């Protein structure tokens, strides 16, 4: 049966279910009719979950602590009859408020309840249907979850008067999830003390095991964090993250922004606080929704299944909370669930919240160092039982506390402190736990309760048990059957010794059973109907199998837990020490050699376990020798491997890391945080780097390591420089890669690689300092659809920004340059252009002037440029023909080859841009100033219209005009003596800045005028610019010469092409 499910589980018909064991000796007839065959299979409608170890792998460090958690889930603390009244419903409204007599069994933190009247109705053996009805009633218990419950005892000072007029005494007030509240009343003081001790102990063991689980979780998962050493240092900065929080179990979750503030004082009583805000905008303390000002305990909540360990992020904080700044703090259980982040493991998220929270409240040794000692009450691992012991304390160990009058007014935290004091005194005497068990067939049993937990008993003792299903039964059984319970069969000599023990059979009366509606009218059953122990002559006792670890009266855990009066004598109890186990004795003097032999069948493998400290045979358990340390571990813990790693580095900043740093990174190579330097430093893996000893896993990791090394060794040079496609597509000159030498070292597997190259290509297109492609093209070149036609045979070549204009470019003698083919995106691989031009000085020295024919001896290449490719002027240039533009009937020079780059965009230099059709009037010019105000800033756009001619510098009118140095020829003979025309990108939009009017004779700038562009040929070659003399004030403006851009402007003597 599932613990937290609200559905009632119904057993099958009696034909398929031979019988059930009695919950208690609830009458002689009732107990005899609920005999159970322990070897029979019990089938339920609910599927029985298999062992988590068989379904999913669990870290070896967590196996012992999970075993203890499941042992606590199945522990049978106490059972008996009492009255219960539900006061409030889950929504806070009044319930029926009627007393009901129930029979209860406390299993772990689950209180199972049956209606005592219904059970009593089917005790008549003469009724043929009573057995069937009894099984149906017994299979439908009501559960109350006490995991997060709050207990309060009532006494005469509370003055709670019932309807009968009497005070409510011997009662407990239990507040559970949401707003549910129950009143439990017991028949006498002894019953009240027993139940109070059992419930207090189960809550203490639950919280202690959760803290121990947190320590094991941090130990096993925290080592996977690459920055765990930094995380565990004593730091003072605040931690902020989005969380979901709820105040009390069952309350709704609310999303808020948590800020963990560290304490500025090192004093013991000064703590930080956790402020919870509704959003991350207002994070001042006066805007806090709630503030956790103190914490008594803080731990990660075990998710009840090993499969959910790495995905659960729930944290429980037991402390004081303030909802208003001026009000006093309230004791609350706060549940915090940090939000998961993308591509971040859940254990990474929860650990990064746990450590700062422990630091701010100075819990468990933080912020200095996490405590790992079992003897320290402030440690996460305090009092943890040493396997094969599975429990912290017995129920009767708490009877002195419940008998004390002062305990009636203790809070939950005070109860925890007093229980810790008892445990600490016992540990000082060599106490290692209680209730050893040897019939473990699986280290991780099912965490769910079944019929065996509710009804089965062994030897009439209500001792805690663990229902472990064997692997064979769980594999062969169907989904609707529980695992078969296996028992240890002792030899005849051992059985005879146990049966002939001198321990007397004690008969005790149970508390009075209330069978009337009024709680003060009671009926006491007969002596024969209530007995906590059955005599040896009883026929029911002969059917039971004695336990392997039998105990005397003073050593049994729960046979006195039933409501009876037994004086508590702590001197009669002897601590079970490891020395007695080594001699084969328990505290009651029984020889356990036969029992220890049964442990050989246990399928439990725990690295560096210290089972050998408690057993005579050291080979009882298989221990991984690869992960064991050379030094012998002490017996102060059952999680030896965890404690050693938990107490040493990197979990303490005062000690160094165990082993080399490379081994640590190799062992946890799947860490969530790793720097690139640390990743590259991992060269190889060795079998000693892994502690699990799994050869198959080592082989897989070795294969992944070799693959990673091959990927890291793979660079750009294996793709760009030596590929066959490069040899086919053409050779590259040394000049082409002068600025790209660093690209060979790029990592192709970098996710930002393509984005970086695209940005670089964009920068090349608009970079004024980049190289400008110039090409040698034929004069008879046809229109390409770009609005440009060739005019003259002009030789152009690549120009680099880092070279001076007097330096001759170097070319590779092995690979002659063919820039026409390099820039052509449609060139087929393996085909070269039919050109025979050479790079001799005679070919490049002669620059054709305007109207000058091309030398007949010069050979030109037959380059064909594709149409309408990356055309920035496609809108205005699509209708151009070979006859030329309407404004310029002459043919123009074609553009150079496409600029190299990832986007293969044409070079912005020397590309003619056709004016807008509506520009029928002369364009206004800028006021005189520096036309190249952008300087060497390549990404700055031009500050003037593409067709606006910049004005000369007024401060130096006689200085030769020095245009932008980007288009300066590289000093080739016969090249340009001055500089090329200014850079005008083809795809720059029209200037949106307000344009100044034409300068008038009376204006301050009237003595300046635009340059006539007389010495600036249209085809791109220019000499030194000679600024004209300043114009006189009284003289008439000279007519502009019909040269340059002015020849396209309409005037009285020029025919307007758009006027037709």
Curated annotation (Swiss-Prot):
UniProt region (Disordered), positions on chain: 1-29, 465-588, 718-742, 801-1060
Subcellular location per the Swiss-Prot or TrEMBL entry: Cytoplasm; Nucleus; Bud neck
Compositionally biased region (Polar residues): 490-504, 845-883, 900-923, 931-945, 1048-1060
SUPFAM superfamilies: PH domain-like (SSF50729)
Keywords on record: Activator, Cytoplasm, Nucleus, Phosphoprotein, Repressor, Transcription, Transcription regulation
GO cellular component, one term: nucleus
Xref: Gene3D superfamilies: Pleckstrin-homology domain (PH domain)/Phosphotyrosine-binding domain (PTB)
Regions of compositional bias (Low complexity) in chain numbering: 465-481, 718-731
Domain PH: 75-204
Main location: cytoplasm
Keyword Transport attributed: no
Biased amino acid composition, Basic and acidic residues: 571-588, 801-814
Phosphoserine modifications at: 491, 510, 518, 538, 556, 871, 885
Pfam families: PH, PH_26
Subunit record text: Subunit of the 1.0 MDa CCR4-NOT core complex that contains CCR4, CAF1, CAF120, NOT1, NOT2, NOT3, NOT4, NOT5, CAF40 and CAF130. In the complex interacts with NOT1. The core complex probably is part of a less characterized 1.9 MDa CCR4-NOT complex.
Record's function text: Acts as a component of the CCR4-NOT core complex, which in the nucleus seems to be a general transcription factor, and in the cytoplasm the major mRNA deadenylase involved in mRNA turnover. The NOT protein subcomplex negatively regulates the basal and activated transcription of many genes. Preferentially affects TC-type TATA element-dependent transcription. Could directly or indirectly inhibit component(s) of the general transcription machinery.
Stated family: Belongs to the CAF120 family.
Protein name (Swiss-Prot/TrEMBL): CCR4-NOT transcriptional complex subunit CAF120
Protein's organism: Saccharomyces cerevisiae (strain YJM789) (Baker's yeast)
